[in-house]
Swiss-Prot record:
This is Mannitol-1-phosphate 5-dehydrogenase. The active site is at K213. It catalyses: D-mannitol 1-phosphate + NAD(+) = beta-D-fructose 6-phosphate + NADH + H(+). The lineage of its organism: Eukaryota, Fungi, Dikarya, Ascomycota, Pezizomycotina. Catalyzes the NAD(H)-dependent interconversion of D-fructose 6-phosphate and D-mannitol 1-phosphate in the mannitol metabolic pathway. Keywords: NAD, Oxidoreductase. Pfam families: Mannitol_dh (PF01232), Mannitol_dh_C (PF08125). Monomer. It comes from Aspergillus terreus (strain NIH 2624 / FGSC A1156). Belongs to the mannitol dehydrogenase family.
Length: 388
């Protein structure tokens, strides 16, 4: 029998990042999703194209050898597939992990294979596989928890690839940045060895990769979007062509770089080169990366361990500079009532209805005695005053 991977989420990242590399590694990919239109398209289309875009041009790959299951209507089929899979991946968004966990738990529990399935969450969040693992344990029979490790191994990952808004009428085809990074922990697999997926960079300690990526790529991307939005820019590349915005992004990434260098021992010149590469990637006009797409979901992006409060809080605890990050947090607070983004409307309501103290606590999760709390509280109050 050939190798089989289950991919939860048939969206652009699922099709255009995860499935691309699973396909190239020789896996049959079984997509699991609840969106009728996505599942139907995958079931009726034998192949789709992934077009990698860089400043040097475009390269198109054809992806085939996949199936799709609607877990809303065919849960038992999805359970059977997981029970015989080699790998389970997901790209559904961190907030959806709790909804896919019961199904994955059933599939794992039904396994009779001697080799455990590899479970890898591919989300923009620190420790996403750990989070999924926790939810799966909640849905595993108590008398089976002790042997869960025999049936599944869970490895955190760090993913990095820009997937811009897609052109209209693209169908299943995906335009995506050529650059990518996919780092995954190898230690959980022990003597069984990790899955054979050449695109993955297998590492012993993932935290430096996750924090470097989240606090450089995601922080830089979102900072560009929030400054750009306030100045009426439409595309990320347009925003970075503005010298003032580019300068602000550099200042933010200088601060996160100081954290990454001091905490993880990454050489300063290596981190500087990484930052320059990231800004170069985001400046690529061929990606047509929309500012509202990058800025959406500000509540999640302002939360405690995310791209702004995460690094700023650690810098504050270490007595290091975090001024530019606080400026960026203010810009994120101003991303309100953007059409098509519910979180930006919710943000506006929180700032309108709550006191500065309550809003700061709810939005950031910071403790009132934290050294970052007061500087952020000042910005919350300022934005509330400006938007009355």
């Amino acid at each position: 029998m050939g190798k089989k991977a289950i991919q939860f989420g048939g969206g652009n990242i699922g099709r255009g990042f995860v499935a691309e590399f699973l396909h190239e590694a020789g896996y049959e990919v079984v997509f699991v999703d609840v969106m009728d239109a996505v599942v139907s398209a995958l079931q009726t289309t034998p192949s789709y194209n992934v077009t990698e875009v860089s400043k040097d041009g475009e390269n198109t790959k054809t992806i085939s050898n996949y199936r799709a299951i609607n877990s809303k209507t065919n849960e038992s089929d999805a359970v059977k597939e997981i029970a015989t899979a080699d790998v389970v991946t997901c790209a559904v968004g961190p907030n959806i992990l709790k909804f896919i966990a019961p199904l994955i738990a059933k599939g794992i529990d039904a396994r009779t294979e001697s080799k455990p399935v590899a479970v890898i969450a591919c989300e923009n969040a620190i420790g996403a596989t750990d989070t999924l693992h926790g939810f799966i344990k909640e849905h595993t029979p108590k008398d089976r928890l002790d042997t869960l490790y025999d049936r599944a191994r869970f490895a955190n990952s760090a993913i990095d690839r820009i997937v811009p808004n897609q052109p209209p009428n693209s169908g299943l085809n995906v335009r995506i940045e050529k650059f990518y990074e996919w780092a995954v922990e190898q230690t959980p697999f022990g003597s069984f060895g990790h899955p054979d997926i050449p695109a993955i960079h297998w590492v012993d300690n993932l935290e430096p990769y996750i924090e470097r990526k989240l606090f450089t790529v995601n922080t830089g991307h979102a900072t560009t979007a929030y400054y750009g939005h306030l100045r009426g820019k439409k595309m990320i590349a347009d925003a970075l062509a503005d010298d003032e915005i580019r300068s602000m992004v550099h200042k933010v990434l200088d601060e996160t770089a100081s954290l990454i260098v001091s905490k993880h021992g990454i050489p300063e010149d290596e981190q500087k080169e990484y930052v320059d590469t990231i800004i170069g990637r985001m400046s690529n006009p061929y990606l047509e990366d929309n500012i509202e797409r990058v800025g959406r979901a500000p509540l999640r992006k302002l939360s405690r361990k995310e791209r702004f409060i995460g690094p700023a809080s650690q810098l504050a605890e270490r007595g290091q500079k975090f001024d530019a990050l606080v400026d960026a947090i203010e810009m994120a607070l101003r991303f309100q009532n953007v059409p098509g983004d519910q979180e930006s409307a919710d943000l506006a309501q929180i700032l309108k209805q709550k006191s500065s103290e309550d809003a700061t606590s709810e939005l950031t999760g910071l403790e009132k005695d934290h050294p970052l709390y007061s500087p952020v509280l000042e910005r919350v109050a300022k934005v509330q005053q400006d938007t009355k």
